[in-house]
């Protein structure tokens, strides 16, 4: 351990490690030598998420608050795979229309059979823009399956329909009716909710934020619910600890060039985070490699 405390040692954290473990490694190697433990694309997306989290125009809703949303738009994220508990909350939220109809008819909420009979197929709008099918499609009011670039473009067009001042980089008119419908549903909602995540890069996140900001500008300046999903248990903690200038790619490059002689890898399989050839070359170039993990991985085998 003593030789890893000397100069020339870098540390690579992990989004599946605890804050305490990541902090201990960062304290040992120094903040400037502590690198993010996920792909460079994910690192860029996480920086965007952190910036949006500090913006007062947006509110990060709890699971209970998600259940109260009365109009929802999901952009480019498979919620069931990334956050199954939130997916369940979304299934609950589409029943809010039925609850409103029951209140108008003076039917108590606890009379579930009567509420369902009254509502029939009436649901609160849940729109999904995605490059693939998802397990929430059965409760969606609108589904648009397009390429990721098209999803981003449609997102910006929806924002521009909500507020003319919102940036609009989309030009296609292929889904103009659906775009108009989704924009009107979000504008009419008492508690609209926009959902995106970092599974498909930062452009989708920026499009979601564009829509939420358009809703905020057209409201009484109350914060708009913007739910940004991350795939691992401590992705946010990892992003808060690793500098924006310290992506994983920079760490691998530093090892290959000889700028760092030793590396400590914390609870991470680097072969899942970057190109195998790049990771292999970096670990081979290092004089000493220390991997701390509870499971056997390609990185521990190296």
Over which residues does each language-model region extend?
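Catalytic alpha/large subunits of respiratory electron-transfer oxidoreductases
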Residues: 1-302
């Amino acid at each position: 351990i003593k030789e890893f405390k000397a100069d020339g040692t870098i540390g690579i954290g992990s989004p599946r490690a605890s804050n305490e473990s990541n902090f201990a490694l960062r304290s040992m190697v120094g903040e400037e030598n502590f690198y993010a433990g996920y792909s460079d694309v994910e690192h860029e997306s996480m920086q965007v998420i952190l910036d949006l989290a500090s913006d007062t125009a947006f509110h990060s809703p709890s699971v209970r608050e998600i259940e109260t949303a009365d109009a929802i738009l999901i952009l480019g994220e498979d919620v069931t795979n990334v956050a199954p508990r939130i997916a369940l909350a979304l299934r609950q939220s589409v029943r809010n229309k039925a609850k409103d109809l029951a209140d108008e008819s003076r039917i108590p909420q606890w009379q579930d059979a009567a509420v369902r009979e009254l509502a029939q197929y009436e649901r609160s709008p849940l729109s999904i823009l995605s490059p693939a099918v998802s397990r929430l499609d059965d409760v969606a009011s609108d589904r648009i399956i397009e390429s990721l670039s098209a999803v981003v473009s449609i997102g910006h067009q929806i924002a521009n329909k909500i507020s003319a001042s919102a940036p609009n980089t989309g030009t296609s008119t292929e889904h103009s009716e659906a775009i108009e419908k989704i924009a009107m549903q979000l504008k009419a909602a008492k508690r609209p909710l926009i959902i995106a995540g970092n599974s498909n890069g930062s452009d989708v996140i920026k499009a979601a934020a564009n829509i939420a900001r358009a809703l905020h500008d057209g409201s009484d300046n109350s914060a708009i619910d913007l739910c940004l999903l991350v795939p691992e248990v401590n992705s946010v903690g990892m992003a808060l600890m690793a500098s924006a200038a310290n992506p994983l790619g920079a760490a691998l490059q530093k090892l290959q060039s000889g700028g760092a002689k030793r590396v400590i890898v914390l609870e991470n399989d680097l072969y899942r985070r970057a190109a195998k050839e790049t990771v292999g070359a970096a670990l081979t170039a290092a004089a000493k490699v220390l991997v701390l993990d509870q499971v056997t991985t390609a990185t521990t085998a190296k």
